Amino acid sequence: MHSPEVLLENSDAVYDYYLRHQQNRWKALGGYAILARRFRPRVAFVDGAKQQLKALIRSGRPVVYAINHLSNSDPYTVAATAWYSPLRSKIGRVRVLAKDELFIDPDQRRKVDMMGGIPVFRGRDHGIRAVNAAGQRMMDICAQRLAAGDHLAVFPEGTCNHVDPTKVQPVGSGIGHIAFRAAKLNAPPALVALAMSYGPQPDPTVEPTAEEAVSARFVFREPVLELPQRPGDIARLVKEELQLAVDGAVARY
């Protein structure tokens, strides 16, 4: 299957491709294992969350993971965390929303595709009106992938937090619309908040380097099995759950 160039003006072909795209699971497992050895995250769970997550994954129900965003290393440290968690069994069936610029360089695109990337054309990069149709299509594709049994990882803050790494930035309604649309396809997802801390940052405007991202603390919250009915309410719940996860990651660093 030909992989189209990831450009906004080509978004229909891009999302047709990523609706059907499937990672090579063995390559994905190898890639995640390498990242796990490189970044060595310290993974923790709130009381009962690990067993609940294991049971949720065994059930086959789709899951949306909401993750805070601190640096450009985050997709790789999150992949390393998946290796050291019950998510290892889902490697190859987890989709990750990633900004479109990560798909420009061919070598980087291969890595992002290996990790299950789905491109996002952001309003801050292209203009809100320009990305509206592509954004609607992206949310539909995510809902369809969830309905097909995939899991979905989202950085719902939308950009790296260069303000205060201990406080979750505003969360847009996109994650709520994805969950809402998946429910309309008879695949209501569960929500799991996953937060990272790279330790104290004297200057939050300077994001952690890849070296500083080694041995980050990650904390999983317990799954939320019943989500609100409206996208905006789902987004508010996401922010609340993610802040609790961030508090835990900072406290346990």
Residue ranges and their predicted role:
Residues 19-42, 105-115, 209-211:
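Alpha-helical membrane-targeting segments
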Residues 17, 57-130:
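Catalytic core of membrane glycerolipid acyltransferases/transacylases, capturing the structured
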Residues 223, 228-253:
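A cross-taxonomic marker for long C-terminal extensions/tails that follow the last structured domain
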Residues 130-138:
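Glycine-rich anion/phosphate-binding loops
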Residues 35-62:
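A short, well-structured juxtamembrane/interface segment
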Residues 141-147:
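Short amphipathic alpha-helices and their capping/turn segments at secondary-structure boundaries
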